[in-house]
Amino acid sequence: MPLPFRTAAIGSTNPAKVEAVRRILGQLAPACAVEPIDVPSGIGAMPLGEEAVRAGANARARAALERSGADVAFGLEGGAILEAGDAWLTGHVVAVTRDGRLGEAAWGRMLLPHVAAERLRGGEELGDIIDDLFAKKESKRQAGAIGILTEGAMSRTDAFAYLVAMACAPFLHPEMYGASAPANARRRRLGPRRVAHRGSP
């Protein structure tokens, strides 16, 4: 059964993120119009740590919902986890409906090259690092680090599309997840905290 949404907002104008939402809603809500909205993540251009990435996705979704008349809004955020001497790529999607329901999904981790880990620790943004290492331009708006490192086997859009689909599960099966307002109940836990970042569409 298709989702009942007629309008959806996405808290980004990044083409890779916008296409991920359009791809999945094209399957789950074919009549839904998607509006990209440029909103701040509140956690800077290079979120570091799972909590920061999650907070950024949440902030994007809520800001997009507030700035639009959409039935549902999506926040997509990518970032890195620094652990010991390694850096891991990760991502998070938050979806919030006009009536207060919440959907969420997160990536597993992808190990980044050690040279990228060193430069992330030095304060650089991953997109800039990847562009420099592979002689690309604005890769984060296209295939992304995932697409480049996997030689196109999976793009940034592909990875985010999986998360968008999974974040829609509570809306597809409200009887299983509960149709009351979990977004309100969990707002405090999801909201921005003091998270590590270095000050992306």
Show which residues each predicted segment covers.
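N-terminal polybasic phosphate/anion-binding patch
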Residues: 1-70
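Anionic-ligand binding patches
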Residues: 46-189
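SAM-dependent methyltransferases
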Residues: 1-6, 174-201
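Residues at secondary-structure transition points
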Residues: 17, 81-85, 197-200
